Amino acid sequence: MSDDIKKGLLGIIVDETEISKVMPEINSLTYRGYAAQDLCSRCNFEEVAYLILNKELPNKKQLKEFKKELSKEITLSKNLISILKKIPKNSHPMDVARTAVSVMGLEDKETKDNSPKANLRKAIRIFAKTPTALAAFYRLRKGKKIIAPKKKFSFSENFFHMCFGKVPNKEIVKAFDVSLILYAEHSFNVSTFTARTITSSLSDIHGAITGAIASLKGPLHGGANEEVMHMMKKIKKPENALKWITKALKNKDVVMGFGHRVYKSGDSRVPTMREYFKRVAIIKKDKIFEKIYDIVEKVMIEEKNIYPNVDYPTGPTYHLMGFDTDFFTPIFVISRITGWSAHIMEQHAANKLIRPLASYKGSKHRKVIQLNQR
């Protein structure tokens, strides 16, 4: 293979962005210039969503208006609810998320309008409605009635309310908020680049986000948090962890939740999420997965010099919160919609069709032989 070919676009800078900056050399991630860790400690998710979409943190008046807009758009159409009821209960929620956003695109009167203001309005609608759609399916597949959102609740509180019919204590809601903030944006990852590529053809925001959701579903991207939990469930208890991870490494199995294409000495989001994983484990009085976490992490670092990524602590945190494992990546979706939307709008603002080249390595020119002579 020629040195000119960069498989996976590794190391290739394809564009500029003002949205986020990943700095592996100093183990840092910023959104619009603000450190993600600082945003986690000082802001709620709605504030960070506003920042990503509008370039600045909101003041009290702006935040109140933003929440009002979300509240206005949070309900689903009767048509979408009807479709959700017809979806097979064994469908993966990521496929449901993709379908729901597609339907939103069919229903949105501004679908064809790619102006900045229209795209922002559509982004807010998708951001508000997607959690409602996912929570509705969460209950429908269990044979339960859909729970309507309540205006008095925050973004995170409403999601718990719509899924479980109750809101947990503030510490768990804060942990969920933190996970959403850490998942909200991460520069030109696979799903974001997918969204920008679709946008570069001047397609609409619903189509771009639908494509991004399909990309995020893969276990090498967003689906890793689900795979982490499947791994921990296989291990079952801390006493099995060392034997399990030793065997996995001997067999050269892929250990999900470890390694990153950008971070090589540790994901900057992990320490913050690890702390909230610990807090949730204490509240739930369940330290089994935390102990498994520590044993597997220690072996991976010592034996392979590979560090965990943010999916590693997030998976068991969502499990302790009560979410089904196949809902972990959809939670990622409801957060990352903010980042995708910002990138879609940024792509429109200075667009150029994304069209890379390929180095052909197939057969040389061949003469076509008639069918009866082959």
Q: Residues of each region from the PLM?
A:
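Non-transmembrane, aqueous-exposed alpha-helical and coiled segments at domain scale
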Residues: 1-374
